[in-house]
Regions:
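Active-site rim/adjacent substrate-binding subdomains
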Residues: 1-147, 152-184
């Protein structure tokens, strides 16, 4: 496995629409290596999701996951943790009209975060890393991460989804001025 270079905001690959991966090619060693490298890169930079375009690969796939403190992956519906997943050619559909604003950051936009409105509950059709068709219902954090990473596949960055830029902030300022607001 290799740690890949992450494209930063301003690089054209982040604004391009990624190409679908033919299902017959998902198990190809090149795609499997890319998935492994995405996981390795995501962990190296302490991310919870990473899309192929973020590592200069214009393909419709991403990895995501959060490991529990005890090292075990948890159920996808848990609001604070999610298992490690690789999704290829995802199609996301909101399940309800409920939209919740939550804080997001991005490895391609280092040290900045903002409040982004997203559907709280979604349905996802995709292929897993073995090339099997899968359907997932996700809510809370997993739904937010899947929508964020799927946006990368369409050339959309998180601040494109922000209702306004009043909450766009550096991480240091977020910790200093915004974190206390979340806890009250």
């Amino acid at each position: 496995m290799a740690i890949l270079k992450v494209a930063r905001m301003g690089h054209p690959v982040l604004r391009a629409k990624a190409q679908p991966v033919p299902p017959s090619e998902i198990r190809h060693p090149r795609i499997q290596q890319l998935i492994d490298d995405l996981f390795e890169t995501m962990r190296e930079y302490s991310g919870i999701g990473l899309a192929a375009p973020q590592v200069h690969e214009g393909l419709r796939l991403f990895v995501a996951g959060v490991r529990a403190a005890d090292g075990n992956a948890i159920e996808l519906t848990d609001d604070t943790d999610m298992p490690f997943i690789a999704l290829v050619n995802p199609e996301v559909t909101p399940v309800s009209s409920e939209v919740i604003s939550g804080w997001e950051g991005c490895l391609s936009i280092p040290d900045i975060r903002g409040l982004v409105p997203r559907a709280d509950r979604i349905h996802v059709k995709a292929y897993d890393r073995q090339g099997r068709a899968v359907e997932i219902e996700a809510q809370g954090l997993p739904a937010r991460v899947i929508q964020h990473e799927t946006d990368h596949l369409d050339g959309v960055l998180f601040f494109d989804r922000m209702a306004n830029f009043e909450s766009l902030t550096f991480n240091d300022e977020y910790r200093r001025y915004w974190m206390d607001d979340e806890e009250t």
